[in-house]
């Protein structure tokens, strides 16, 4: 449980093979079966952890319907039905919103709101390891601290980067 409405899921290949490589900020497509619709439903989720852990992690916000709208179908299935040990279909990591050059000396500003923090965390984690002296500004807004997922990871990455600063707006 990452926050009041966000849960992380960790995946490894069922064949025991290696986890595919990916760039910080990339995503995977998750397919789960909807009993109500009798069909597999795909959704894209950012990989919310830097590569190298031997697992893929996604962090999923439970989408609750408002004003008569239904709850999020796939987020509800993931939060309420998927258990440790279940097999879930994932695509290979992909996506163009990625930190491609962690070694760059150019200053970097990362801005996120709500669940949009998920691509920023692996970017910060990668920078903390590969280029800890890079000047980075991380700006994040959320409803309140109960809705601040991955806070520990952000704090740990920023702590290891002497030229980094963060601004949190509630």
What is each model feature region?
Residues 1-87, 142-144, 155, 169-170:
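Ferredoxin-reductase
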Residues 47, 117-129:
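Histidine-anchored nucleotide/phosphate-binding helix
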Residues 92-105:
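A short, basic/flexible loop-to-alpha-helix module at the beginning of a structural domain
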Residues 105, 129-136:
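Conserved S-adenosyl-L-methionine
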Residues 109-111:
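Conserved beta-strand elements of the Class I
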Residues 127-131, 157-158:
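Active-site catalytic pocket residues across diverse enzymes, especially alpha/beta-hydrolases
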Residues 135-170:
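Reductase modules of NAD(P)H-dependent flavoproteins
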